[in-house]
């Protein structure tokens, strides 16, 4: 008889499966709250592993970024082509308090704006708000036909494009540098800056579809809990903020 391993003794019991544990039993659900700048405060829910040992659930949640359609935040389908980024800065009970982290256009909207027979003009500016948030704003605009124009094309000359771009950067710099991040958000929702650029450039070349297509947050100031709580109002459980009307207009300077 050959000396070797007894295969029968080494085998385990047949039919015994490894016990699987559902990972969702170790998770907790938290509500994501948008700032009171937006009409709808209740963004949704997020999951996180329950606090155990040295791993704190709050630390895992802080810094999370959520991308939400502005149409959902404002209950208005006209804003469906814009996406807002919200960053979790503080946890209060089972609520994640967020702050504005950026704005962007959907790809299909941007592609639908670009057409033949017109000039596309883009500008960007890096600006610091009054509460020390460093932002980069990207604007986009397109030329349109003048009244009673017969010519098919609406191409602007290079000198006109440079003049329009200069106006765009000046207006973006002025509007963003003179207000806080929350005030700038109220200007971005009804597209106040885009309308102001359109008015200011009428004398150079008429424009259409003028938008702040993207807002990028480059640097945030030191975290201030009081400022964040003020941004969310006195009650952090309130699901509604104040509505920003589309008809909101600011006084335009005569010298522009």
Curated annotation (Swiss-Prot):
Component of the small ribosomal subunit. Mature ribosomes consist of a small (40S) and a large (60S) subunit. The 40S subunit contains about 33 different proteins and 1 molecule of RNA (18S). The 60S subunit contains about 49 different proteins and 3 molecules of RNA (25S, 5.8S and 5S). Keywords: Acetylation, Cytoplasm, Ribonucleoprotein, Ribosomal protein. Residues 1-18 have a biased composition (Basic residues). It comes from Aspergillus niger (strain ATCC MYA-4892 / CBS 513.88 / FGSC A1513). GO terms for cellular component: cytosolic small ribosomal subunit. It comes from the Eukaryota. GO terms for biological process: translation. The keyword Ribonucleoprotein applies. Pfam families: Ribosomal_S3Ae. GO terms for molecular function: structural constituent of ribosome. Belongs to the eukaryotic ribosomal protein eS1 family. Coiled coil: none annotated. Residues 1-21 are annotated as: Disordered. This is Small ribosomal subunit protein eS1. InterPro entries: Ribosomal_eS1, Ribosomal_eS1_CS, Ribosomal_eS1_euk. The modification N-acetylalanine is found at residue 2. The keyword Chaperone does not apply. It is found in: Cytoplasm. The lineage of its organism: Eukaryota, Fungi, Dikarya, Ascomycota, Pezizomycotina. PANTHER family: 40S RIBOSOMAL PROTEIN S3A.
């Amino acid at each position: 008889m050959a000396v070797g391993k007894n295969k029968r003794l080494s085998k385990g019991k047949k039919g015994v499966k490894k016990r699987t544990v559902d990972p969702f039993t170790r998770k907790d659900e938290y509500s994501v709250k948008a700032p009171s700048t937006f009409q709808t405060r209740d963004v949704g829910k997020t999951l996180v592993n329950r606090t155990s040992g040295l791993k704190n659930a709050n630390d895992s949640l802080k810094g999370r970024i959520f991308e939400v359609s502005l149409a959902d935040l404002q209950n208005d389908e006209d804003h469906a082509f814009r996406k807002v980024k919200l960053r979790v800065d503080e946890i209060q009970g089972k609520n994640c308090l967020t702050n504005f982290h950026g704005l962007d256009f959907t790809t299909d909207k941007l592609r639908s704006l670009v057409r033949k027979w017109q000039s596309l003009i883009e500008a960007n500016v890096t600006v610091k708000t009054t509460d020390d948030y460093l932002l980069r704003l990207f604007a986009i605009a397109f030329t349109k036909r003048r009244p009673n124009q017969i010519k098919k094309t609406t191409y602007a000359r290079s000198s006109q494009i440079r003049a329009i771009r200069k106006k765009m950067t000046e207006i973006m710099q002025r509007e963003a540098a003179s207000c806080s991040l929350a005030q700038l958000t109220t200007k971005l929702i009804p597209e106040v800056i885009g309308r102001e650029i359109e008015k200011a450039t009428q004398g150079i070349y008429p424009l259409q579809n003028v938008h702040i297509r993207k807002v990028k947050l480059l640097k945030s100031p030191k975290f201030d809990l009081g400022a964040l709580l003020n941004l969310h109002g006195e009650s952090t459980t309130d699901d509604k903020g104040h509505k920003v009307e589309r008809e909101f207009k600011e006084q335009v300077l005569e010298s522009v």
